[in-house]
Amino acid sequence: MKNHNVEVLAPAGSYDIMKAVINAGADAVYLGGDMFGARAYAGNLNKEEMIRALDYAHLRDKKIYLTVNTLLKENECTHELVDYIAPFYEAGLDACIVQDMGVFKILHSAFPDMHMHASTQMTITGEKGASILKEMGAMRIVTARELTLDEIRQIHEKCDIEIESFVHGALCYCYSGQCLLSSMNGTRSGNRGRCAQACRLDYSVVNNDKVINDSKSSYPLSPKDMCALDILPDIIDAGVYSMKIEGRMKNVTYAAGVTSIYRKYTDMYLENGRKGYHVSQEDKNMLLDIFNRGSFTSGYYNSEKGKNMMSLSRPNHMGVKALQVVKNDNGRILFKALTDINPQDVFEIDSDNAYTSGDSYKKGSTFTVNLSRKLPLYKDRIIYRMKNGSVTKEIAEKYASQAGTLKKPVNMLFTAECGKPMKLELEACNTKVSVFGAYAEIAGKQPATVESCIKNLSKLGNTDFTAGKITADIGTNVFVPVSILNDLRRKGIEKLTETILDKYRRQTVDESVYNVCKASSKDISVTVNDSIHDGKYSTSVYLKTKGQLKSYILSGLNNDNVYADFKLFDDDECRKNIKKLADSQNVTAALPYIITQSQNRIFGSLIENIRSCNIEMFLVRNLEEIGFLGNLGQKTGFVPKIVTDAGLYCWNSFSVLQLRDIILVCGCELTRITLPYELNYKEMNMVNYGVPTEFVAEGFVPVMISKQCVRKTYGLCDHNNGIIYLNNKRSGTYMVESVCSFCHSVMYSAKRIDVGYDSSLLEEINPDYIRKDYDNMHNETAWTGHYDVGVE
């Protein structure tokens, strides 16, 4: 074993669930407050509950991490953000989990001694991105769920930063932080904590104009949940410090039940090693009962992507096989129990009807129930249990009740000697305190005994402590009133509690912390060349295919900038044409949306091909690419010029500042940034970018970047780039492109953005560059995106 210091990190959507997961064995809990969290529809905690949660956790030597993992608009990066965090910081908040680079900059500047965790929404896929975040001040990264064990191991070995990775729960189809599917179907943005779960809808899969799926496989974007119990030792040995359980939207049964299982097996491995590590089928069955989407996978750690990772027939809880219909006599149903049945088990009959068990039945036994004759309960039909009454009851009693409350043992020493003040010393959580009472007097009739004093001191009731080792040193013939003993115990516990919490608490925030909110975009203008914009727009055109490249060259068009998609550089003829084009026009190489740790060699070859065409400007889509180009530039002496794409979010001035600093530190030059798809023109105008901007005025929006591939899921993988379509009756038809060289797929919006060069929106946004796809497609589904409306 390489890593003996690990953390079980549990989710909580409410104060009560927070208590339950700590009682169930969590070392730390991540939860959201009432602002800026990526689960806007979870219960979340208000200010008072959050401070109570911090105290509850700290008295038990546990940690609380606050999610501030949404993108913030310019008008939100104000005193309001600092005001929101300040009371939690003062109360000892252990860390903030952050997505927005601007929020990261503000909070790290305002509260430098508070740990910052880089959210999985930052799409961290390799050690270069991890190193950048460490340089920014991150104490921990939450890796993308898509990384393999070997990729995580390499990050651990090459970058000295804490690693947090998911081990259980729902998997997003898209790389977290790169999904615009919900947003582009309405106004609910996943980047604002309001994901509408469009990935869990049904779609027809269309290949060569033919629908190739049916009702049994109509959820092509819905992955099964992950359960990493079987490979937990491998995950720990790969360097994962914090094992994260997904589920801030889940109930207490899920959160506490799953936490208890991962506590059990983490301890089993740390105490007994691999030889003593064995996962029982009973515990796996319990997890399936709690929630599953048709069995589990171990995620991307060691699973091959494709059909086996997907829940194609159903996107929600599938339950477990529990009953078989033996006979239906006009509504009198004879069931056979396929597993042990408990009181309050709930069984799904159809979407509108369920049956709740009133008794216990052993596996293999039969029993009769009277149900509506209209229900589709035909012979041999299998009925699934959706709720296990026994598991629900057990978890509630163990972890969600007062009896299940985790308490720290407190040791006490009581001293009473005639003529001296009575004294009570208490010790817990590496903290010692003493309190004093009245002077001890000689007993008139009944002197105090050691046993009676210990008995009274042990009565800790509903405090946060339980009696540990309690001793009493009492002189001869000493009188100790019970009232004084009770008062000493009460004062002692109060003092001990406050002393423990004082170790976590910080000084009141000084007014100077608000100065960070005044930095704004004026600081950008000082350190980045001002945009020279005279009201005329420079034009960029995006060439994706070999045919488009040939057509563009033959057209004789001359744009201010030409984007050549990275796939073009794999072709000898394309490289020759691009090199020739670069002699007369500015050509920028558009890099892949995602590169992972294991793809460095392939990416290096791509950059060599690009550089052979005399190109030094790159459209980058992630931090890993910035780090790679920076390292390459330092080795070879050239300074890569960078255009950031929309997925490197710049929603506010501070994110621009942070991104600029990253690029400069990496030894690159920030040429311009691409404006976000999800801000409207008013919100964009609030940001003084201080660097040339580019606006995507025409084209399909990449709404999902996924390690999965629809073509592979449906048995069409030929290891060649290809196109397939998904159709949803409500939202339209989406094109999904397989990108085989970097093993991911890109799903594009059903509706095409087409603002038009004469649009009043362009005048309102006033960008330096406008970008369009070179495909000349104009269709009835074109719209202006969120540039006019925005997102919630």
What are these regions (language model features)?
Residues 139:
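Long, basic N-terminal domains or extensions that often function
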